[in-house]
Structure formats: C-alpha cells, structure tokens
A protein has these predicted regions:
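N-terminal targeting signals for export/organelle localization
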Residues: 1-46
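Short gly/ser/thr-rich secondary-structure transition/capping motifs
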Residues: 44-53, 118-121
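Hydrophobic beta-strand anchors of alpha/beta hydrolase catalytic cores
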Residues: 64-65, 92, 138
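Structural microenvironment flanking redox-active thiols in thiol-disulfide oxidoreductases
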Residues: 76-111, 122-128
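Short, conserved active-site loop motifs that form the nucleotide-linked donor/cofactor pocket
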Residues: 90, 116-117
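Thiol/disulfide oxidoreductase modules built on the thioredoxin-like
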Residues: 110-114, 121-167
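Short, solvent-exposed cationic patches
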Residues: 167-174
Length: 174
C-alpha cells in the first residue's frame, strides 16, 4: 500500500505536467478561423459606387463576404487572390469598413474590383454585428448563414485549408 502511494505521488504530478505541456504546445494552425454557424445579420446599407441601398435579403445563394478598407495593408496583399477567386466564378460581396468613400473608390479603381457589389459600412455597424475586429476578414455564406469566418489574409493555402473543405461538404458554388 505504501509503495502504491509513493508511486501515485510521482505518477500523478508527472501526468498532469505532460497533459498541461501537450495542451500548451498544441499548435492551432488557423487561429483566425471560426466555424460557428450563425445568421447573416439584418442590414440595409448603401452600395459604394451608386448610393443605392441593398439589404441582406437581396443577397441570394452562396457567396463570400470580404471586409476590407483602403487603409488596410493586408487587404492590399490579399487583393490579387480575391481577384483570382472572382475570376474563377466565386461571388464576392465587399464590405468597405470604416473608410472614406472617395478613398475606397480610388483604391478599387487602382487595384481592380473583384466584388459583385460593395457596401459602405462607414461606422462599422454591420461589421460589428458580424463579429469583425478589423480588416481583412472573410466570411463564407451558405443559404443566408455564415458557415466560416477567417480573420486575416486569404491566400491559396488558407482558402484550401479553411474554406474549401466546407465548400465541398456543402456542395457550394455549383
């Protein structure tokens, strides 16, 4: 009995240390990824280039929402990748986040416009309702529900690891 007690005094702390160490060193490959499903918030905002209002109820099917701004350096880095997605038939809705209209229009004119439509979220209200903490952030929308969310630059690797498995599983963009 005494030997068992001595053995448990040694094994128990070592076990806790190993478990704690494993949990601390476990690497989350995509810390910016969030797979909680939630409804796209209700909104009505003006379209960036013509001041016509658009509401969430006007958006149908499967699409990507990209939150961007002209002042965002990472948005500039990911922009060519978004253009390639659009060229390959992925519909992208832009949310211009806390930006000046003239700056946003100039930016799109200079770098190209991969968005089917861009709404102007001057105050960041819609972005806040969606859980946005900054730009860029990208959302995958399936049947009016946000099914994936990524904070940070979208590139081929992130797209293939974070979004593509969900797209394949749900049969999106067909």
């Amino acid at each position: 009995m005494k030997k068992l007690l001595q053995l448990s005094i040694i094994i128990l702390p070592v076990s806790f240390f190993l478990i704690f160490f494993i949990l601390l060193t476990e690497e989350n490959q995509f810390p910016g990824a969030d797979y909680r499903e939630f409804d796209l918030p209700v909104f009505e905002l003006k379209i960036l280039n013509n001041d016509v209002s658009i509401a969430n109820s006007d958006l149908e099917g499967d699409y990507v929402i990209n939150v961007w701004a002209s002042w965002c350096i990472t948005c500039r880095i990911e922009h060519p990748y978004l253009a390639s997605l659009a060229k390959n038939g992925i519909p992208i809705i832009g949310i211009n986040y806390k930006d000046e209209k003239i700056d946003a229009l100039e930016w799109l004119s200079k770098y190209g416009n991969p968005y089917q439509v861009t709404v102007q979220d001057y105050k960041g209200t819609l972005a806040l309702d969606m859980g946005v903490t900054g730009a860029p952030e990208t959302f995958l929308v399936n049947k009016g529900k946000i099914v994936a969310h990524y904070e940070g630059e979208i590139n081929d690797y992130v797209w293939n690891q974070v979004f593509d498995p969900i797209i394949q599983e749900r049969g999106m963009f067909k």
